[in-house]
Amino acid sequence: VRMLVDLGLISGYTDGSFRPAAPVTREEIAKVIARLCTDDPQAENLTAFADTAGSWGNLYVCFCAERGVITGDGQGAFRPKDAVTARELAKMLLVVLGEDGTRYTGSGWGERVDADALRLGIYDGFGGKLDSAVSRDDACLLIYNAMQCPAVVNEKATGMMRYALDDLMNPKTYMETRFGLVRYTGVLEANECADLTTAGGKLAVGMSKLAGHKEFAVSSDLSLLGRTVDIYMLNG
């Protein structure tokens, strides 16, 4: 949740709460998805659906429709106030990642979404029902998982040619290609509190070190020492 807030993808309510168990509407998720795609979502056609015209979320809904992320109910409506299901959100995320959205339409679309979402890890840690309303907390989980997936640049290619690649020819995650963030994972062996590798040692204030990695300009507390943690840094 904190990462998505820091990236400007989500926010809480005016009373300072987040309401993690509350359902997410289709209109609300369209805004999140649009921001996941770009900092400045725009749409050429602002009349994609009759039931969103004039609403606060119309721009985001139309932006997503133009990108093939959402398709409505087939009757010209989007049902913006309905709750979005986990499977519907997964479908949107797959298209954002660059997968061919036409695969997720028609008969059996849900099975194809589930197969791809499971394969990529989008459902990792999710214990709810895929066809039920997804909570705000679980929506954050699915979005976070999707951002760790490879960014597809050519859905018709095979193998590594499908993905954006780094200098070592490894697939870049969507998080890296969109936000420039790279994840480093390892055991936290030293910070400003102590150094597990040197008796009485410690790092400068605001520094942390993972085993097998250089020092990072990131603060961490004593309780994290010796534990496996993730550190996210801007690439370059």
Map each language-model feature to its residues.
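OB-fold/S1-family single-stranded nucleic acid-binding modules
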Residues: 235-236
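Short, flexible surface segments
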Residues: 136, 225-226
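Feature responds to low-complexity, polar/acidic, surface-exposed segments characteristic
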Residues: 1, 7-59, 66-87, 93-133, ...
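Conserved redox-cofactor binding core of oxidoreductases
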Residues: 144
